[in-house]
Amino acid sequence: MENWKQKPLSQVVSRWIRGTTLNRSRADYYTKTPGPESLPWARVGDMKEGLLCETENYLTKEGVDQIPWLIVPEGAVLLSVSGTIGKSAIAGCDLVVNQAIQAMIFDEGQILPEYACFYLEFYRPWLIERANAVTVPNLTKEQLSGIPVVFPCLEEQQVIVDQLKRARRLMQRSRRSEDTLNRILENAFGKMARSALKEGKISRDEELLSPVLRPIWVSLKTRALPAERET
């Protein structure tokens, strides 16, 4: 675990883009047909596993020209933060998202987008738990910024990503359920987290731990960590 680090999400994301919805009465802003100057306009319902580039609706050039600063570049990580919480995907091309999606451009010198996407998928129970449930569940940038992200060097991240992608492909071929993927994610990140918790590389603040990690920490506490036995 020597190569592992922990940082808040705010320190590994170089740019945040929260989407919007243009005036739906402006028919010239929207199209169902992709074209050379249009961009996909992603909503939560468009988010599938892996890369996202095809959407139900697209913004025309006229629409895109209204919000050029909100164009999400290829490779950004997408996270649903309103209504349906915690779905994740990666922008497979330049696109625009609506207000229910938070796009994050990661510092790829620290974290690979695919690793970040899988990590957020693993962390989804915590995201759902923390969402502001008034009428519609919602997560703010401030809430996301403090998420503790645990990550190894880029080479090890790629190994983890390759293993998880292979497991996902096998799962899809055998038509296994989403629960199977959740178990795979928990196995991949849970073992790592257990070691990191033991060594103090993950914050032991139970308020910051995901519902998946919290039971691991509680079980470790009851058995007393080595560092605690020394004090």
Regions found by a protein language model. Name each.
Residues 1-25, 146-231:
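Non-catalytic DNA-recognition/assembly elements of restriction-modification systems
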Residues 8-16, 47-54, 70, 74, ...:
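Basic, amphipathic alpha-helical recognition segments used for DNA target recognition
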Residues 10-31, 45-74, 231:
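Sequence-specific dsDNA recognition surfaces
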Residues 27-31, 45, 74-75, 134-138, ...:
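Juxtamembrane/interface motifs at transmembrane-helix termini
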Residues 35-38, 143:
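A short, glycine/Asx- and small/polar-enriched loop/turn
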Residues 42:
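ATP-grasp fold ATP-binding core
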Residues 79-80:
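A generic structural signal for residues embedded in beta-strands
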Residues 84-87:
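Short, charged beta-turn/beta-strand-edge "cap" motif at the junction between a beta-strand
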